[in-house]
Amino acid sequence: MINHSLKQLADMLASKEISSVELTQEYLNRIAQLNPEINAYITVNPELSLAQAQAADQRIANGDAGPLTGIPIAQKDIFCAKGWRTTCGSRMLENFIAPYDAGIIERFNAAGAVNLGKTNMDEFAMGSSNETSYFGKVQNPWDRSRVPGGSSGGSAAAVAARLCAAATGTDTGGSIRQPASLCGLSGLKPTYGLASRYGMIAFASSLDQAGPMAHSAEDMALMMNVMTGFDERDSTSLQREKEDYTRELGKSLAGIRIGLPKEYFAEGLDAGVAKVIEAAVDEYRKLGAEIVEVTLPNTMLSIPVYYVLAPAEASSNLSRYDGVRFGHRAAEYDDLMDMYCKSRAEGFGEEVKRRILIGTYVLSAGYYDAYYLKAQQIRRLIAEDFAKAFEQCDLILGPTAPSTAFKSGEKADDPVSMYLQDIYTIAVNLAGLPGMSIPAGFAPAADGVELPVGLQIIGNYFDEARMLNAGHVYQQVTDWHTRMPEGIAS
């Protein structure tokens, strides 16, 4: 049961071969067995999940089922879900019970999907290793001594360990794609504004975007059909005609132009990862694609630009956590100002504090022009680089991450080294483009352990259907997306 695609599961549910209650219980049993070690979930509520499964079975019996009705989906703990604890991986929201559903949760509920639980994440989505969570680090199912990536590391580990059929994530600078790469699954960050941000706890509002994490491009296309659409409650939501993201699946890739940015294959890319990506490019050649070289000259500026803009927005967004209206409040304080200081000092972890300090600094009167304004100008240049590249090609291919999964704690005391994990993904967020990672093979770590490698596919604005087809066609001639970690009983 746990190795079937979303479409296969939907067919099995429709034919009454299995019930949603049985499927949900199977995943809950696996969570009880494996989650104490992997730590992919922060909150599981079997009573709520099974009630949704019973309702889904009734919908199926009534002939009112959609493609995801009855299918258990894990939700990143950044989305408010009514009646569920919603922590964002932080002590600040340790006991916060959401009073309403996020737009994304509403859409899955309307589709009849089952909320299997809330997945672990880097605190307030700030991290690339899922080591900053107040609720403990997440283990990579491929090697328990390694990180799953972040910030959507819990969702990635849950999908990889077959603790859910699929999951949601959010991506501010690579937080869907990088963990998808490190855990050997597929993940998609849609064009900025396609998926509702209503009820999604904000990190950097001009960069955050929700997206699917699953085993295959086909599974992600089905999820995109549910997740995307205009939401008037979200000021960044785009009004566009509803799309069917499965419509391109299976189309020939003959004649499609694929761009390879030379900057993505320069110094800093692990040799084993480079070899896997080159093999994937060769596969696309065999499928009829035309390979062209493109240039993204401002790529290397994306990290410093991001670490000015994202912390600036975070320092503003996180100012609401003051211990007054909701969130952690210090037990002892002398006056109101002391309460603010102690509540925030106790409630936020070190990485969150670091980014708030950076953001406050770059927004200060003496440095606004030198840092924040300059970063916005370079952000525009990065977007223009992509626009020029897409005049020469239809899709851009490259590595998702510069290396395979690293050891837990290896980069914990070196923030710059950690930040460089997103060197190939951040520019996509800065430009607002869609980006996707799919499994492309395995490469050896320094100790010889073979670990998953992700291939990144970048498209032009609103070109998700073409990207998903490119991933789907590749997955029809390879089996990387079907591989399972050892020790994960099927």
Curated annotation (Swiss-Prot):
Purpose: Allows the formation of correctly charged Gln-tRNA(Gln) through the transamidation of misacylated Glu-tRNA(Gln) in organisms which lack glutaminyl-tRNA synthetase. The reaction takes place in the presence of glutamine and ATP through an activated gamma-phospho-Glu-tRNA(Gln).
Protein name: Glutamyl-tRNA(Gln) amidotransferase subunit A
UniProt cross-references to HAMAP family, sorted A to Z: GatA (MF_00120)
The encoding gene: gatA
InterPro entries xrefs: Amidase, Amidase_CS, Amidase_dom, AS_sf, GatA
Keywords, sorted A to Z: ATP-binding, Ligase, Nucleotide-binding, Protein biosynthesis
PROSITE patterns for this protein: AMIDASES
Group of enzyme by EC: ligase
One annotated GO biological process: translation
The enzyme's E.C. designation: 6.3.5.7
Organism: Methylobacillus flagellatus (strain ATCC 51484 / DSM 6875 / VKM B-1610 / KT)
SUPFAM superfamilies: Amidase signature (AS) enzymes (SSF75304)
Gene Ontology terms: cellular component: glutamyl-tRNA(Gln) amidotransferase complex
Family named by the database record: Belongs to the amidase family. GatA subfamily.
Active-site feature positions: K76, S151, S175
Alphabetized GO MF terms: ATP binding; glutaminyl-tRNA synthase (glutamine-hydrolyzing) activity
Organism placement in taxonomy: Bacteria, Pseudomonadati, Pseudomonadota, Betaproteobacteria, Nitrosomonadales
Subunit structure: Heterotrimer of A, B and C subunits.
